[in-house]
C-alpha cells in the first residue's frame, strides 16, 4: 500500500474495530454517490458504511452484487470513474483520497493531503485530471496518470492547490476539457478557477445557504447550482451573473443531473422528490418520483431512459424518466405538449439495516442494538461477534432484563456512524485497561476451579486483534519454546478490520486481523502502534490495578466490638466483598477462616478446637455480615459495584461488619487490606 504522508508530530492514538460479517453485500447506511460505467453496466456506489460496492445493472435477477472495495473507515462522500473505467477515485470523511483498480477492486494508493473531511471530487475526462475538496477549505488538483503509476519505489506525487476559499467546500465540478473548475461552499457563493493556471477568475453571489451540488456545461460557459436554500440557479460565466433561478423544491437541492444537450435538469432534494425541469422554461416540469428519504445522488442508467437514485436509506432505486412530447399542431394553431408518464420503478438494489440505537450493558462485555428495521441484536464486544438476533422485541424491556447489578468501568466506546458497530479503544476519556474482572465472570467457559484469576478485557482484546503481529527482530525468550501469540483464551474473526487513528482526527493505518502477519503490515504497525498497545501486546506488560479506599467499622449491634473507630483500608476495586469478610475474621477478630470453595476439613485439620469448630469450618461470608448504607451486601459483589449501586457518594466507601454467630475473638486490627489483596 502506498501512502502520501505529511510530516507531523506524533499525536494521541486510538484503536477501533468493526463487528461485522466477513462479506457485507448490502449497504448498511445511506449512499452518497454513484458512478455508472457505460462500457459494461457496472454501477459503483459509495456508502456511508465506508464501503464502495459494485453492481451488475445488466443482471435481470435481484442478485446484482459483484464485489466490495474496502479501505476507507468512514463515510465515502464521492467517487469518480476515470481512465475509461479502469480506475476509480474516492473521497472520504476519513480525510483521505484513494486510488483504486476498479476492475479488481483493490486500493492502489492513499493520498493524505487533506486535513479534514474530503467532501467532493471533480473530473476532467479529456485531461485525466481530478480535483478534490473538503471541509479544510482546500482544493487539490491531481494528475490521474501520475496517481495510477505510483509504486513502492516511486511513491512521490505532487499536487497543485487552488487557494482562496474561506469556508468548508461541499461541491465541486469541472468541464470535460478541464478549462473551468467551480466550487460551492457554506460561504453561499460559487468560486471559479482556471485549473490550467490555478488562478481564480471570479466569484458569483446569489444563494443564501450552502451550495450543495454543481454541474458545468461541456463548453464551460454555464454552471447549474443547487443549494440548501431550495433553489436551482443557472449562471452565465461570460456575463458573470445568475441568469435564472428555479423554484421547484420545498427544501434543499442536494443532487443535480443534466441531459446531454444541457436542456433539462433532473434534481433531487431533501424534500424526497426527484423532478425534471426544462431549463429554458422552468414552468415546464414534472415529478419523476417521490423517494422515501432525502435524495443524495442521481445517475443515468445504461440507455438513459431511467435514473438511479440514492437516499439516506440504504436502497438504490432506478426510476423511469418521463419524456417531454411537444405534440402535434392543434385546431387553434398551438402545440398539445405533454410529459409521458414516468416514475415507474425499473430496478431496486436492496440495502441492509443501519444500527440506530445502542446500549452498553452493565457487564461491559455485551452491547444491545436496535436497527432501522426495529431488529434487536446482541453483540459480544470481547469476542467481536454477533451473539444473538432477538427480532423486533421491546428494546427498553430487553435492556432492563439483561442489565445485571454489577458495575464495571467503561473501557470502550461505540460509534454507529457507519451503521455498523465500531468499537473504539483508547487512553483518553475512557481507559481501555480499566476493566478488571474475575475469569469466572468474564470467561466462565475458561474457568479452572483450582485457581482464581483476574483478567483485563482491554488487554485480552488487543492481544486477540493483533494476534498475528510479530515485530521485526523479535526473539523468543526461550528458543526451545515457540513465541506466544494472542491471549491464550480465544480468537476473534480474522476478517475484522482494525483501524489506528489519531484521537478525533485522521486515520493512520487500517488492516484486517489476518493481515497483521504480512511484512509490510508488521512494519507499518511498528511505526504507528502507540506505546500503550505495544506495552501489552508485544512487551506483555500487565495493566495497573485500580484501587479503592474504604472504611471498615464494627456494626453498632456487635456485642463485643474490638474498637469503635473506623479503619481506612485500600484494595483493588475488583476484590469481592467475601475477601473483606475474610479480612475481618483473620485480621480484626483473629479467627480461623476457610476460603470460599475450599475444603473446610482439610484446611482446618490442624487447627485447635475453640468450642466453635463447627462454625469455624464455614466460609467467612457465612460468619461475617457486611453492610453499607444499612443494606446487607452480597459477598459476591466487588468493591466498585458496592460503591456504584449502594454507597452512591463521592466520599470514601464505608462498610460495617458484624458476626452472624457468637465467636471467641481477641487481638487488634491487622494490617491494611493492601497486603491481603496482593495474593488474590
From Swiss-Prot:
Start-end of Low complexity biased regions: 596-609
Domain of life: Eukaryota
CDD domains: Ubl_WDR48, WD40
GO molecular-function terms, A-Z: ubiquitin binding
Residue ranges of the region described as Disordered: 594-618
A UniProt-annotated Pfam family: DUF3337
InterPro entries hit by this protein: G-protein_beta_WD-40_rep, WD40/YVTN_repeat-like_dom_sf, WD40_repeat_CS, WD40_repeat_dom_sf, WD40_rpt, WDR48, WDR48/Bun107
Keyword annotations from UniProtKB, A to Z: Repeat, Ubl conjugation pathway, WD repeat
PROSITE patterns: WD_REPEATS_1, WD_REPEATS_2, WD_REPEATS_REGION
A biological process from GO: double-strand break repair via homologous recombination
WD repeat segments: 26-65, 71-110, 113-152, 164-203, 206-245, 248-287, 290-329, 350-389
Subunit text: Catalytic component of the Usp12-46 deubiquitylase complex consisting of Usp12-46, Wdr20 and Uaf1; regulatory subunit that, together wtih Wdr20, stabilizes Usp12-46. The Usp12-46 deubiquitylase complex associates with arr/arrow; the interaction leads to deubiquitination and stabilization of arr/arrow.
Family: Belongs to the WD repeat WDR48 family.
Protein function: Regulatory component of the Usp12-46 deubiquitylase complex. activates deubiquitination by increasing the catalytic turnover without increasing the affinity of deubiquitinating enzymes for the substrate. The complex deubiquitylates the wg/wingless-signaling receptor arr/arrow, which stabilizes the receptor and increases its concentration at the cell surface; this enhances the sensitivity of cells to wg/wingless-signal stimulation.
Protein name: WD repeat-containing protein 48 homolog
Source organism of this protein record: Drosophila persimilis (Fruit fly)
Gene: Uaf1
Amino acid at each position: 500500500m502506498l501512502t502520501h504522508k505529511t510530516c507531523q508530530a506524533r499525536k494521541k492514538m486510538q484503536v477501533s474495530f468493526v463487528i461485522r460479517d466477513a462479506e457485507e453485500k448490502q449497504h448498511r447506511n445511506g449512499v452518497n454517490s454513484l458512478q455508472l460505467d457505460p462500457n459494461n453496466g457496472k454501477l459503483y456506489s459509495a456508502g456511508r458504511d465506508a464501503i464502495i460496492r459494485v453492481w451488475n445493472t445488466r443482471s435481470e435477477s435481484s442478485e446484482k452484487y459483484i464485489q466490495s472495495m474496502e479501505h476507507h473507515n468512514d463515510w465515502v462522500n464521492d467517487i469518480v470513474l476515470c481512465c475509461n473505467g479502469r480506475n476509480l477515485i474516492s473521497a472520504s470523511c476519513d480525510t483521505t483520497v484513494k486510488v483504486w483498480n476498479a476492475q479488481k477492486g483493490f486500493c492502489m494508493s492513499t493520498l493524505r493531503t487533506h486535513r479534514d473531511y474530503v467532501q467532493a471530487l471533480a473530473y476532467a475526462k479529456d485531461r485525466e485530471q481530478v480535483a478534490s475538496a473538503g471541509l479544510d477549505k482546500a482544493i487539490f488538483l491531481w494528475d490521474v496518470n501520475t496517481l495510477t503509476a505510483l509504486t513502492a519505489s516511486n511513491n512521490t506525487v505532487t499536487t497543485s492547490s487552488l487557494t482562496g476559499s474561506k469556508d468548508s467546500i461541499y461541491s465541486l465540478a469541472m468541464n470535460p476539457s478541464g478549462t473551468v473548475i467551480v466550487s460551492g461552499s457554506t460561504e453561499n457563493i460559487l468560486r471559479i478557477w482556471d485549473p490550467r493556471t490555478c488562478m481564480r477568475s471570479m466569484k458569483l453571489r446569489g444563494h443564501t445557504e450552502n451550495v450543495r451540488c454543481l454541474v458545468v456545461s461541456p463548453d464551460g460557459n454555464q454552471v447549474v447550482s443547487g443549494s440548501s436554500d431550495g433553489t436551482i440557479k443557472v449562471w452565465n460565466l461570460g456575463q458573470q451573473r445568475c441568469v435564472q433561478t428555479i423554484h421547484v423544491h420545498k427544501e434543499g437541492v442536494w443532487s443535480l443531473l443534466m441531459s446531454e444537450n444541457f436542456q433539462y435538469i433532473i434534481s433531487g432534494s431533501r424534500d424526497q422528490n426527484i423532478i425534471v425541469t426544462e431549463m429554458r422554461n422552468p414552468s415546464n416540469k414534472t415529478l419523476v418520483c417521490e423517494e422515501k428519504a432525502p435524495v443524495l445522488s442521481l445517475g443515468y442508467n445504461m440507455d438513459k431512459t431511467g435514473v438511479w437514485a440514492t437516499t439516506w436509506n440504504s436502497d438504490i432505486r432506478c426510476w423511469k424518466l418521463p419524456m417531454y412530447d411537444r405534440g402535434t399542431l392543434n385546431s387553434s394553431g398551438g402545440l398539445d405538449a405533454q410529459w409521458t408518464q414516468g416514475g415507474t420503478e425499473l430496478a431496486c438494489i436492496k440495502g441492509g439495516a443501519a444500527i440506530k440505537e445502542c446500549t452498553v450493558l452493565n457487564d461491559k462485555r455485551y452491547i444491545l442494538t436496535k436497527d432501522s428495521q426495529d431488529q434487536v441484536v446482541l453483540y459480544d464486544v470481547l469476542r467481536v461477534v454477533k451473539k444473538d438476533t432477538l427480532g423486533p422485541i421491546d428494546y427498553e424491556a430487553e435492556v432492563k432484563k439483561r442489565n445485571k447489578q454489577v458495575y464495571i468501568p467503561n473501557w470502550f466506546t461505540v460509534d454507529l456512524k457507519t451503521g455498523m458497530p465500531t468499537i473504539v479503544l483508547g487512553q483518553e476519556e475512557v481507559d481501555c485497561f480499566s476493566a478488571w474482572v474475575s475469569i469466572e465472570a468474564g470467561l466462565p467457559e475458561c474457568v479452572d476451579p483450582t485457581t482464581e484469576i483476574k483478567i483485563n478485557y482491554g488487554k485480552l482484546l488487543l492481544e486477540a486483534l493483533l494476534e498475528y503481529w510479530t515485530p521485526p527482530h523479535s526473539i523468543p525468550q526461550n528458543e526451545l519454546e515457540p513465541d506466544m501469540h494472542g491471549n491464550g483464551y480465544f480468537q476473534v474473526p480474522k476478517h475484522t478490520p482494525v483501524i489506528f487513528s489519531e484521537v478525533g482526527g485522521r486515520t493512520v493505518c487500517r488492516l484486517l486481523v489476518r493481515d497483521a502477519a504480512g511484512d509490510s503490515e508488521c512494519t507499518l504497525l511498528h511505526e504507528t502502534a502507540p506505546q500503550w498497545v505495544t506495552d501489552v501486546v508485544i512487551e506483555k506488560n500487565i495493566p495497573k490495578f485500580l484501587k479503592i479506599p474504604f472504611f471498615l467499622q464494627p456494626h453498632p449491634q456487635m456485642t463485643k466490638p474490638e474498637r469503635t473507630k473506623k479503619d481506612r483500608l485500600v484494595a483493588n476495586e475488583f476484590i469481592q466483598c467475601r475477601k473483606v469478610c475474610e479480612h475481618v475474621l483473620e485480621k480484626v477478630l483473629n479467627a480461623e477462616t476457610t476460603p470460599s470453595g475450599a475444603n473446610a476439613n482439610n484446611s482446618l485439620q490442624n487447627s485447635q478446637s475453640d468450642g466453635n469448630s463447627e462454625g469455624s469450618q464455614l466460609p467467612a461470608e457465612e460468619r461475617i455480615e457486611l453492610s453499607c448504607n444499612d443494606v446487607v451486601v452480597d459477598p459476591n459483589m466487588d468493591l466498585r459495584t458496592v460503591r456504584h449501586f449502594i454507597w452512591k457518594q463521592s466520599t470514601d466507601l464505608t462498610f460495617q461488619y458484624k458476626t452472624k454467630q457468637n465467636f471467641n475473638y481477641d487481638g487488634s486490627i491487622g494490617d491494611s487490606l493492601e497486603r491481603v489483596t496482593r495474593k488474590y
